[in-house]
Amino acid sequence: MGLFTTRQLLGYTEQKVKFRALFLELFFRRTVNFHTEEVMLDKITGKTPVAAYVSPVVEGKVLRHRGGETRVLRPGYVKPKHEFNYQQAVERLPGEDPSQLNDPAYRRLRIITDNLKQEEHAIVQVEEMQAVNAVLYGKYTMEGDQFEKIEVDFGRSTKNNITQGSGKEWSKQDRDTFDPTHDIDLYCDLASGLVNIAIMDGTVWRLLNGFKLFREKLDTRRGSNSQLETAVKDLGAVVSFKGYYGDLAIVVAKTSYIAEDGIEKRYLPDGMLVLGNTAADGIRCYGAIQDAQALSEGVVASSRYPKHWLTVGDPAREFTMTQSAPLMVLPDPDEFVVVQVK
C-alpha cells in the first residue's frame, strides 16, 4: 500500500475524524476560510466591522501599552506531526488477538489513521481553547512559529464578568429559603441580547440544585432542542443537560484538554457560570495553508491540510502531519455574561 493522496486524507478527516467540542458546536458554528495568511476581520460579517486589540505577551505579562487595534490578524500556525516506523508495524497492536495477528500492512494503515486522529484532536483542542477563552473573558492568547505570543482582545465590557461579592455568595445562602432567580435575571440583563443557555461546572450545579426553590422551578421533563442535542452528541460522558429553568437551558460541562505538561485539565474553571445564547455569531476563521505542496494541489483556503509523505534515505522514513491556521472570532463578546460563583 502506497502513500495516501491529499484528497483521500481530506475525505477521511472530514468524514471519519470528528471531535466535537462544546463551545465550538454551540457558539462558533460558521466557518470562513481565507486565501491569505492574514484573517480580514472586517470581511467576516455583514454587520458592524469587527476589530480586535492585539497586545504582545512577554514573560507571561500582557503589554497593552505596546498593543493596538487591528482588523487584519495573522493566526498562529498549528501543524502536529507523527512519524511512522517499521517496528510499529511488526509489533502486535493493543487489542489484537494473538491467535489472529494482523498483517503489517493492516497495522500500518491502522497506525497512520490513529496518528491522523491525534493530529485532528490536537488542532480541535487549540480551537476549543480559543473559543472557551473568548466566551469566558472576551480574549485569548495566541502564539505561532513565526511570531511571539500575543493577546487577542475582542473588547468584553468589564460589567459582563462578575465575581459574587461579600454577602452575595450562593454558598452562604439558606438552602430552603433562598431563590437564585433574582440573581440570574440580573446577570442575564447585562448581556447584549437574549440569554437562553447556562453552562456551568459541577460546583455551580451542586450549589444551584441544593436550593429548594431552584429545584421546584427546574423543568426536567421538557427535552432539549435539536441544536443542543447536536452540540452534546458524543459528549454524553462529560456534558449533561439538566433541564430548563424558565427559558434557560441548564447544561453541566466537565470537558477537558491535555495541557503541555501532559496533565488533563478542565476548560471551565471551578465555580464558573456562563450565560449566553446559542444563536451567538462566533466564527471559525482560518488563514491560508502555508505549504508549497498544498499550493500546487490547489488547497489554500482550507481549515485543514493533512499530508502523508516518505523521506528517501537509509532507512526511509514515513510521516503524517495536519496543518491549520485557526482564529476563533467573537464579534460581540457582550452576548455573554460570566459569573464566578462563590
Swiss-Prot record:
<keyword id="KW-0426">Late protein</keyword>
<keyword id="KW-0946">Virion</keyword>
<dbReference type="InterPro" id="IPR005564">
    <property type="entry name" value="Major_capsid_GpE"/>
</dbReference>
<keyword id="KW-0167">Capsid protein</keyword>
<dbReference type="GO" id="GO:0030430">
    <property type="term" value="C:host cell cytoplasm"/>
</dbReference>
<dbReference type="GO" id="GO:0039620">
    <property type="term" value="C:T=7 icosahedral viral capsid"/>
</dbReference>
<keyword id="KW-1145">T=7 icosahedral capsid protein</keyword>
<comment type="similarity">
    <text>Belongs to the lambda phage major capsid protein family.</text>
</comment>
<comment type="subunit">
    <text>Homomultimer.</text>
</comment>
<keyword id="KW-1035">Host cytoplasm</keyword>
<dbReference type="Pfam" id="PF03864">
    <property type="entry name" value="Phage_cap_E"/>
</dbReference>
<protein>
    <recommendedName>
        <fullName>Major capsid protein</fullName>
    </recommendedName>
</protein>
<comment type="function">
    <text>Assembles to form an icosahedral capsid with a T=7 symmetry. The icosahedral capsid is about 60 nm in diameter and composed of 415 major capsid proteins. The assembly is primed by the interaction between capsid assembly protease and portal dodecamer, and major capsid proteins assemble cooperatively to form the procapsid with the help of capsid scaffolding protein. Major capsid protein forms hexons and pentons of the icosahedron. Viral genomic DNA is packaged into the procapsid through the portal vertex. The packaging triggers a dramatic reconfiguration of the capsid shell.</text>
</comment>
